[in-house]
Regions:
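N-terminal beta1-alpha1 ligand-phosphate binding loop
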Residues: 1-29
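Glycine-rich phosphate/pyrophosphate-binding loop and the adjoining helix
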Residues: 4, 135-174
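Short hydrophobic segments within beta-strands
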Residues: 6-8, 35, 109
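A general structural signal for well-ordered alpha-helical segments in protein cores
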Residues: 16, 20, 55, 83, ...
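Short beta-strand elements in bilobed, periplasmic/extracellular small-molecule ligand-binding domains
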Residues: 30-38, 42, 135-144
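N-terminal beta-loop-helix "entrance" segment that forms/cooperates
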Residues: 36-54, 149-151
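Helix-loop-strand module that forms the ligand-binding subsite of alpha/beta enzymes
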Residues: 50-132
Length: 174
C-alpha cells in the first residue's frame, strides 16, 4: 500500500515536516512518498500541456496511493500559497484523466506555535478538497497548537498521532 505526504513547508526544522515524519512511523507497512513545495513549479496553465515529467511522476504516485496526507502550516490565518499551489496543480485535468483528486482519500494535519494549531488553514483546505470531490473525513484532522521548536510537542501528542493514523487507516482501507 502507498501513502503520499504533501508537506507544505521547505523550512529546515519545519514543525509540519516533523509531524509528518512522526505520522509516517504509524504507516510502517506502507510505501511512503513525500512531496514539498519546491517539487512544484508555480502554477501556470501555459505549463499544463504537454505535461512535464515532474508533474507526471507526482500524479502517478498519487494515482497509485491509497491516501494523501497534507501537512500544512498556517500563515496569517490561512493556507500558505505554496500548499494551495500544490493542490492547484493536482486539481487540473491532464490528457489521461479528468480529475486526480476526485475520489482520492485525503487527510489534513498541521502544527503551529500559535493558538489555533492551523485550524483555519485546515478548514480552508478541507473546503477546497470537498469542492474537488476528494474523499475526506473532516472529523479526522490533527491541529496541534503551541508547539515548541525543539519537537517536544511530538512526545506530548503521541496518542493523538496514533489515533489519527489509526482512524485514517480505517478510512482508506474501507
Amino acid at each position: 500500500m502507498k501513502l503520499v505526504f504533501l508537506i507544505g513547508s521547505q523550512r529546515e526544522g519545519s514543525l509540519n515536516k516533523l509531524l509528518a515524519k512522526e505520522i509516517e512511523k504509524e504507516f510502517a507497512d506502507y510505501d511512503i512518498v513525500e512531496y514539498y513545495p519546491n517539487d512544484f513549479k508555480i502554477f501556470n496553465q501555459d505549463l499544463e500541456h504537454p505535461e512535464e515529467a515532474w508533474i507526471k511522476k507526482i500524479r502517478e504516485d498519487i494515482r497509485e496511493a491509497e491516501g494523501v496526507i497534507i501537512a500544512s502550516p498556517e500563515y496569517n490565518y490561512s493556507v500558505p500559497g505554496t500548499v494551495k499551489n500544490m493542490v492547484d496543480w493536482l486539481s487540473r485535468p491532464n490528457d489521461e484523466e479528468k480529475y486526480l483528486i476526485g475520489g482520492k482519500n485525503f487527510a489534513v494535519v498541521g502544527v503551529t506555535q500559535g493558538l489555533d494549531g492551523t485550524r483555519l488553514a485546515q478548514k480552508e483546505l478541507i473546503a477546497v478538497l470537498h469542492q474537488l470531490r476528494a474523499n475526506i473525513d473532516a472529523s479526522n484532522f490533527m491541529a496541534v497548537p503551541f508547539a515548541d521548536t525543539e519537537g517536544k510537542f511530538i512526545a506530548d501528542n503521541k496518542k493523538r498521532i496514533k489515533d489519527f493514523a489509526d482512524k485514517f487507516k480505517k478510512f482508506i482501507e474501507k
